[in-house]
């Protein structure tokens, strides 16, 4: 199982940060795993997408739910697929003149002990990826 948390403070407002990730199309600009996806359903605050996640050498077809709570948080969660669990939340907290974005990522792979060993090897890669997402979020946020 991969379970990671990373955070970063920004000099942007909560609204500016949320606008950068308020839809799955915008989130795909910073989350590279979402390069090839298809929106199956879209409404305010909820999008259902079909995606293919590449995990090292294995590809997982999955259906994801992208839920948003305006100016507070977003959640990308697997609702159907071969992975045992995929959950990524983005929480925006206001602290004085700065805002902090916290990313929580949780992935459980199938394949029993082999999946566990692969997840141990992949954990540093995913730590680097969510760090990169936080840096990209700063670049694409409109001031």
Residues of each region from the PLM?
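Hydrophobic ligand-binding cavity/cleft-lining segments
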Residues: 1-44
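Beta-strand/loop substructures that line and gate deep hydrophobic ligand-binding cavities in soluble
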Residues: 78-128
